[in-house]
């Protein structure tokens, strides 16, 4: 398995891009807001964009090394790059699109293209043109074309952004299977936390031009560590906080003291609670830990859950978000949060 080593800098219009990470096998996600440098990172790895300094290596091969004056063209990098738009050739058939990226003799190219069409269930569409294909079919053609070349590394840039929401879930299952069969390093760029969670073993959170957090995907959602990571993984409730005990923090924007199941660091600047982690509490219970009296501000009912905006009734400050399953017919007077579900965050 070839190790991808990335360590480069590039000055962008609004901020410097400094990317440093290693990847070896599996599927890795880069989660970040629009404009943070995700796509530019991909372009540098693929050879479409040129860094100002640093190096990019894949195994023992230098794809880019400013000091050694190495900058391989895209066709020599063995990097498969799936663009957001899929970048199919509009005047070529499905068969021709897949065959176009394959090197070798005509008979071998034809055989490989037919093999990939069968694998991706495209044989019946062989003579069709991209304009007549659905978004899901276009994605399969683009992926078949890339994998037909047997790349050493696969880059997927927002792979589902061009698809209708009802198609995404089915295609995510398909893609997960294709990536498993690919068996080499895949990196997915996305701002969609659900895509990242479903597909990626490890996730890197990107701020403006740098990787801020890198860890196992499930661990990232459990303990995101940084405010930006908490927001990008879907945490609606984030308050400024200060330590007020070994296992206690005061959430300044909510006016409530919270107990956690671990020691509170002096570096903590914020605290987070996911909207699904509030649970109804009994007002008469002696268990007062992390119990908050509810003053409802607004509520919205969706087909399968409620979204409720509420304040701490005894010290009303900023709103908090709570989500409840539709089976709960009444909004609770009190809610409670498990100490282990509270997120301790740094700016």
Which residues make up each language-model segment?
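Non-catalytic connector elements of ABC transporters
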Residues: 2, 6-33, 39-40, 47-50, ...
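ABC ATPase nucleotide-binding domain helices that frame the ATP-binding cleft
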Residues: 39-42, 141
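ABC ATPase nucleotide-binding domains
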Residues: 78, 93-228
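C-terminal boundary and immediately downstream tail of ABC-type ATPase nucleotide-binding domains
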Residues: 221-244, 270-272
């Amino acid at each position: 398995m070839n190790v991808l080593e990335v360590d480069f800098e590039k000055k962008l219009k609004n901020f410097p891009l400094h990317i440093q990470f290693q990847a070896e096998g599996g599927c890795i996600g880069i989660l970040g807001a629009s404009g943070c440098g995700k796509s530019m990172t991909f372009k540098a790895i693929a050879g479409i964009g040129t860094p100002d300094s640093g190096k990019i290596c894949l195994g023992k091969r230098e794809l880019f090394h400013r000091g050694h004056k190495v900058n391989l063209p895209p066709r020599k990098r063995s990097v498969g790059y799936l663009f957001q738009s899929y970048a199919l050739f509009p005047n070529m058939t499905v068969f021709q699109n897949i065959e176009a990226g394959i090197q070798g003799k005509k008979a071998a190219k034809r055989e490989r293209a037919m093999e990939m069409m069968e694998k991706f269930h495209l044989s019946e569409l062989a003579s069709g043109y991209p304009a007549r294909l659905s978004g899901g079919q276009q994605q399969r053609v683009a992926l078949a074309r890339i994998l037909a070349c047997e790349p050493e590394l696969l880059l997927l840039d927002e792979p589902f952004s061009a698809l209708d929401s009802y198609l995404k879930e089915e295609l995510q299952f398909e893609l997960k299977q294709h990536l498993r069969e690919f068996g080499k390093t895949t990196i997915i760029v996305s701002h969609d936390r659900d895509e990242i969670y479903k597909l990626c073993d490890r996730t890197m959170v990107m701020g403006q031009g740098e990787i801020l957090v890198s860890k196992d995907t499930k661990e990232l959602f459990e303990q995101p560590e940084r405010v930006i990571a908490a927001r990008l993984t879907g945490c609606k409730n984030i308050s400024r906080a200060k330590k007020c005990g070994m296992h206690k923090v005061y959430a300044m924007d909510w006016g409530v003291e919270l107990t956690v199941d671990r020691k509170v660091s002096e570096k903590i600047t914020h605290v987070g609670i996911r909207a699904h982690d509030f649970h109804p509490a009994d007002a008469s219970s002696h268990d007062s830990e992390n119990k908050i009296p509810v003053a409802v501000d607004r509520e919205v009912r969706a087909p399968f859950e409620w979204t409720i905006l509420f304040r701490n009734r005894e010290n009303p400050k900023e709103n908090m978000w709570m989500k409840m399953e539709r089976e709960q017919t009444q909004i609770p007077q009190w809610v409670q949060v498990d100490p282990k579900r509270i997120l301790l965050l740094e700016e």
